[in-house]
Amino acid sequence: MMALIPLKVPAGFYRNGTDLDAAGRWRDGSLVRWRDGSLRPIGGWQARKNGFSAEPTRGMHSWEANDGTAWLAGGSHTELSVMTGSNTVHDVAPSDLATGRADAEVETGYGYGFYGTSFYGQPRPDYGNYSEATTWSLDNWGEYLVACNTDDGRLLEWQLNTGTNAAVIANAPTSNSSLIVTEERFIFALGSGGNPRKISWCDRENNTLWTAAATNEAGDIELQTSGQIMLATRTKGQTLILTDVDAHTARYQGPPYVYGFERVGTSCGAISRRCAADVDVGVFWMGQRGFYMFDGNSVNELPCEVHDYVFSDMNTAQQSKIWAFNNGQFGEVWWLYCSGDSLEIDRYVAFDYK
């Protein structure tokens, strides 16, 4: 009998190039991870709550109130839902919340394009431009929930009273694309006032004061970028701001300028408004054609051995739905996305950062 020869196959899948290029590597698989050099199932999951929202959720946030109550918030294109630790769900969206879109849509409706183009009575051509699926940015201002969705554009606050809907923050700018609460307790309104490059912030610890004066720390700035602001996240004592083309940081420096802004990366823009995850080693995100990490100082592109598989079979029309999350127990970042023929999320790609 011939002796058994141990196979030492490196961890991770390889899907770049041909099958021959992947010789000696794992080629395909799903819902597995490597631990201590061995391939194992991820372990499964279970539903926490059925019927959390009537529509697909495009943004979630969990936090704890001052009394220890656990809360989970999530938003769809029609709802803003909150749930207690006991699984009781309440819709706290304002009654006049702007109706958004469950899916990205081709921009061919009234008002799209320049006046006088194309022929009267003829169908408008599809130029490949899409209105994004509605997504939410959610955060907590102390124990209160603050929220903004891409179609409504107002900054909302919910003060933990399930009998009262979220209310518009007084004096805050409108037509915003998203928000973030900084480590220093300022609210950043991103895409402020409909300007895709503008950031406005309230006075410190006062989210109803937005007009800059010598006696407060409110302010605004227009980023020097050729792109539009997509998202922001807290990391390592600063705020990372991602546009669709580059990356910037905001660092608190006190009056008179309050914040200092610096571009820290180029050609590394975010593919969606939910594509970044902050972990202890930095921020990871998906770009248009790759994956990136900010370590607190600089941006680096991540080597990806499944790059061709992911980006060659993705429904880019629905890329606004791409969602990242941190699976901290296993030191992983996951990205959920739509495959080429799918209107809804049906695939994932995961990166082990430990």
Report residues per predicted region.
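Beta-sheet-dominated scaffold domains
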Residues: 4-6, 11, 138, 186, ...
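Short coil turn/linker residues within repeat-based beta-strand modules
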Residues: 87, 152, 162-163, 206, ...
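Asp-box/WD-like beta-propeller blade repeats and closely related beta-sheet repeat scaffolds
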Residues: 131, 160-181
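Hydrophobic or amphipathic alpha-helical targeting/insertion segments
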Residues: 140-168
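Beta-sandwich interaction modules
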Residues: 121-141
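Surface loop/turn motifs at the tips and blade-to-blade linkers of beta-strand repeat domains
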Residues: 50-55, 168-172, 221-225, 263-268, ...
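N-terminal beta-propeller domains
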Residues: 1-119, 157, 176-249, 336-353
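Beta-propeller fold detector
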Residues: 90-100, 166-171, 212-214, 259-264, ...
